[in-house]
Amino acid sequence: MFVFIGCTRLAGSDYPMDTKFLTLSKREGRGSLEVTNAALNYGYSILEKFCWSALENAGLELYAGLLHVDRPGKPSLVLDFMEEYRAWVVDRNIIKLRARLGKETSLTPDLKTEIINGIDATMSAFITHRGKKVRLENIMQRQAYRLAGAMTDGKRYKSIRFKW
């Protein structure tokens, strides 16, 4: 998990250009006015809430990260945990909206609704995990418990792999 997440972080700046997003010339963080960046940021904020809830239910300290630097007010562990789900939950949904994003100049309420609905559908979707059909939201909760086990009992944490 740790090596994989570190590699994805380093590759993140090249990712959008490689997938030929219509409106994205470079990745920008919070406060971006460019529509694709704003859509990604909006989607990540929704994903953050799902991850926050799963980790909190598992009894983990949300501000004590493993990869992200601990900073006051930053839920570092939540940001670490999100890495496992970013591409599958958010990026896929934003890519599906690329035709709309190319026509918009800002993140409209209708576009926000589409992002919310897409992410909600993804989190509610049944995925085969360990031989069983399980909702992604439940898989996320199980992964949070596994992470708690890895942190407290020294067990090995194995991240989930999504098949495109």
Regions found by a protein language model. Give the residues of each.
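Active-site helix-to-loop segments that bind/position phosphate- or nucleotide-bearing substrates
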Residues: M1-W164
